[in-house]
C-alpha cells in the first residue's frame, strides 16, 4: 500500500470498516460516514508499524488536538516515535458480512450509490503500551463492541486477551476501497470484489450495480 496517498482525517471521525462518501477530489477533503455495517463475524486486521516523519506527525497534530498521546517528535533525532496502520485483511469475509441479512439496509444503500467507499485502512496514534500489546498478539480482528461501534480484538493462543476501543486512538489518515458488482449463477446482482481506490473492476464486474443489472438484462434478450 502507498501510505503517502492516504486521505487525512481532520474534521470528521473515521473508523475502520465504516462506509461513506468522499467529498471533493483532493486527499485532504472530507469523508462523510453514511453507513456503519454490523460485523457479527470478526474481520482479520493486518498491523503495520511505521516511524513518524515530519509530514505524518504534522497530520497527526491536526487530528489530535493538543497532542493527546504526548508523542515527542524531533527531526534531528534518529530514533522516531511510531504510529500504526490497520488494514482490513480478509476481503472475502468482509464481503460475506456485508451481504448478510443483518446488513440488508447497508447493502441496499451501497448498491444505489456507486460512489460509496469503505474505509479499509487507517493510520492511527496510540500509546506505546498499546503498540506493545498489538505486537504481542498472534492475530487482531475488527469486531462490534456495541451498536454501531467497533473495537480491536487481540488474540493469543486462540484466546482474546485484550480489546482496544477506537476512542483510545487518534486516527489521522485513511484509505478507501470501492465495491464491484456482478451477476451470480442465480442471475442476481451480488458483490464481486472490493478494490483499492485507484483500481478498476475486473472483466464483467462493475462499480455501478445498475450497470451490472443492465448487462444482465441485455444478455437476457
Task: Show where each model-derived region lies.
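An N-terminally focused, membrane-permeabilizing/fusogenic/translocator signature enriched
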Residues: 1-80, 198-221
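A short, structured loop/turn motif at beta-sheet edges
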Residues: 141-148
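Membrane pore-forming effector domains from diverse proteins
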Residues: 32-37, 70-139, 153-219
